[in-house]
Amino acid sequence: FLVELFKLEVPEVGQGLIEILGAARDPGLRAKISVKSNDPKLDAIGACVGMRGSRVQSVSNELSGERIDIIMWDEDPAKFVINAMSPAEVLSIVVDEEKKSMDIAVAEEQLSQAIGRGGQNVRLASELTGWDLNVMSKDDADNKIMEENQNLSEVFKEELNVDQDVADVLAREGFSSVDEVAYCSMEEFNSIDDFDEELIQELRKRAIEKIEA
């Protein structure tokens, strides 16, 4: 229904110049829609908002004053989520593709705005993007990363029989399992300044032996 209202109010949507790719609603209270322009010269958000907000206001009035956030769609999931979290500003984001979740860090003073009343903002952003979103303060996010890296370092020390420094570098560079060490390309490994070729070959050898054991 929300999408149909925009088709009526925004000619560019009806003409296919702008696509509405998704919508998430808390009926009567708030909604988020994602838009994409098929014409590089056309500002999708500006067209949907209308002059002085006239178009989006007309849609809002039809829905008992429902507040509508118009979000720019992006093929990069992280960028799309950052857009969807508006009006909160995302400081950092950690993507877990396996769990299809993201940890989102915002400034302490923006935490309540990012989460929204009763979790509304993050819930709608999650529904719109299709990702599980965990919002936290920057300090909490940094502490979580530090704790996870420490845990991974211990795993690498034990599983690969390496010293603390090597284990710390593996964790810091984003390796999350022995499997990833085993099957990482030489090109990716060579981008790590702390490792020379001899160490890389030894790490891969130990990782493969561990997996096949």
Give the predicted meaning of each segment.
Residues 1-213:
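RNA-contacting regions in translation and RNA-metabolism proteins
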